[in-house]
Regions:
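An N-cap/entry alpha-helix motif that binds or orients negatively charged groups
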Residues: 1-69
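Conserved, mostly hydrophobic/aromatic
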Residues: 21, 78, 99, 157
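A short, Lys/Arg-enriched amphipathic alpha-helix followed by its capping loop at the start of a domain
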Residues: 74-76, 95-104
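Hydrophobic faces of well-ordered beta-strands that scaffold small-molecule active sites
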Residues: 76-79, 104-108, 127-131, 155
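Glycine-rich phosphate/pyrophosphate-binding beta-alpha loops
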Residues: 80-86
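Active-site-adjacent beta->alpha loops and helix N-cap segments on the catalytic face
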Residues: 88-90, 108-126, 134-142
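Acidic (Asp/Glu)-rich catalytic clusters
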Residues: 96, 101, 116-124, 147-149
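Internal gly/pro-rich beta-alpha loop/helix module
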Residues: 136-158
């Protein structure tokens, strides 16, 4: 299967499973702990129907939305994922570039492979920082100060 033949989530998942080494695919495809939250979230989509408005003009479609105080062109954002260079050589820079291209927000994990400052300097699109709280309060303080200095727009506590 080639990328140009991917038309839905399952197609992309099948392609990824074929191309990415097993342990890395399982990391991306899996979920935390017992995966109960993943199951509940997935099942909730069974109750959601996307119904297109047919025979209506598309010249004035506005998908912009405000999320966590950030103005986005799309009602989606690229969520933070740790260790992104495992599955793309540019890591967070690739996600930030895609988010900037489409005018949406992207997230950087505190377990990211690219520094907050580097990503922030290259891409001015809204950015959120997924912060893992540590027992070492001085480490927490340093990480929060670094995010603030980089100009991060939104903090997410994990």
């Amino acid at each position: 299967m080639q990328l140009k033949h991917c038309h839905n989530f399952n197609d992309f998942r099948t392609l990824a499973k074929r191309r990415i080494p097993g342990p890395i695919f399982n990391y991306i495809d899996g979920a935390a702990d017992d995966e109960k939250t993943y199951d509940r979230n997935t099942k909730s989509f069974d109750d959601c129907d996307l119904v297109p408005s047919i025979l209506r003009g598309t010249e004035t479609v506005d998908m912009s939305v405000t999320v966590m105080g950030q103005e986005l062109n799309l009602p989606i954002y690229c969520s933070p994922t740790a260790l992104q260079r495992l599955f793309h050589h540019q890591g967070e820079n690739a996600v930030a570039a895609a988010a900037a291209k489409f005018g949406t927000m992207f997230g950087v994990s505190s377990l990211g492979t690219v520094s907050l400052t580097e990503v922030r300097e290259k891409y001015k699109t809204p950015q959120c920082y997924q912060f893992y709280f540590h027992k070492d309060r001085s480490l927490n303080k340093a990480m929060l100060e670094s995010a603030k200095a980089a100009g991060v727009d939104v903090m997410m506590l994990t």
